[in-house]
Design a protein with these regions (language model features):
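Conserved pre-motif I regulatory segment
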Residues: 1-45, 151
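Short hydrophobic/aromatic beta-strand immediately N-terminal to the Walker A/P-loop
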Residues: 43-45, 73, 179
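Conserved SAM-binding loop
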Residues: 6, 24-25, 74, 124, ...
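Post-DEXD/H (motif II) to motif III coupling segment of the RecA-like Helicase ATP-binding lobe
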Residues: 141-210
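The conserved Walker
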Residues: 46-50
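Short, conserved catalytic or interaction motifs in soluble domains
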Residues: 9, 56, 66, 87, ...
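Walker A/P-loop NTP-binding motif
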Residues: 30-42, 52-67, 80-83, 87-93, ...
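Conserved nucleic-acid-binding Ia/Ib motif block in the N-terminal RecA-like helicase ATPase lobe
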Residues: 12-15, 68-136, 144-147, 190-194, ...
Length: 211
């Protein structure tokens, strides 16, 4: 795949990519997107700045455009990364694609997040701690999530988020698609992938510096 126009995706998503000036895929996007569009799980090794965000966002948006009853959940280690991801999603959904999203991170107003959740956002992006806060409050429902992204998973485990991630996974239906990305693949990541991913396709790329 040399151009996003070659993808078998909804026309409004193609238009949105063009408006946002996303034309040529990075190596991780060229590898991951066609696999994710087939509904397969992915175990991906990629550094920050290789273009992972679009690699998981394009298949997610395509799925949500086709199926109006589903949600996507993106879990990442830091507020900064979560904010960058939501910015990309907002850029792609601001015109024709009317799919609401919510950013669940610490240090931000809980009331504002509750208001956004009440608007039935279908894309949830957040850090493990704040997502768990909302699960405890019963303000977040994950029962119709069928697309899960774990981004920079090695960092999340290094930061001690394993129990929170495992708790989040209890709230998601057993049958769902998972894309797990990590800069490295130590044994604890492989254990998580064996436990939670279904016959994942393994992909790996080096470093670049794009969203």
């Amino acid at each position: 795949m040399n151009n996003f126009n070659e993808l078998n995706i909804e026309s409004k998503l193609k238009n949105s990519l063009k408006y946002s000036n996303f034309i040529k895929p990075t190596p991780i996007q060229a590898k991951a997107i066609p696999i994710a569009l087939k509904g397969k799980d992915i175990l991906g090794t990629a550094q920050t700045g290789t273009g992972k965000t679009l690699a998981f966002t394009i298949p997610l948006l395509n799925k949500l455009i086709i199926n109006k009853n589903t949600k996507g959940l993106i879990v990442c280690p830091t507020r900064e990364l979560a904010s960058q991801i939501i910015d990309t999603i907002t850029k792609l959904t601001i015109n024709d694609i009317r799919i609401g999203s919510v950013l669940l991170i610490g240090g931000e107003s809980m009331q504002r997040q509750l208001r956004q959740l009440n608007k039935r956002a279908r894309i949830i992006v957040g850090t493990p701690g704040r997502i768990n806060d909302h699960l405890k409050r019963n303000s977040l429902k994950l029962s119709n999530v069928d697309y899960l992204v774990l981004d920079e998973t090695d960092r999340m485990l290094d930061m001690g988020f394993t129990p929170q991630i495992e708790n989040i996974l209890k709230f998601i239906p057993k049958i769902h698609q998972t894309l797990l990305f990590s800069a490295t693949l130590p044994s604890n990541i492989l254990k998580i992938s064996e436990k939670y991913l279904r016959k994942p396709e393994r992909i790996s790329v080096g470093s670049l510096s794009t969203p």
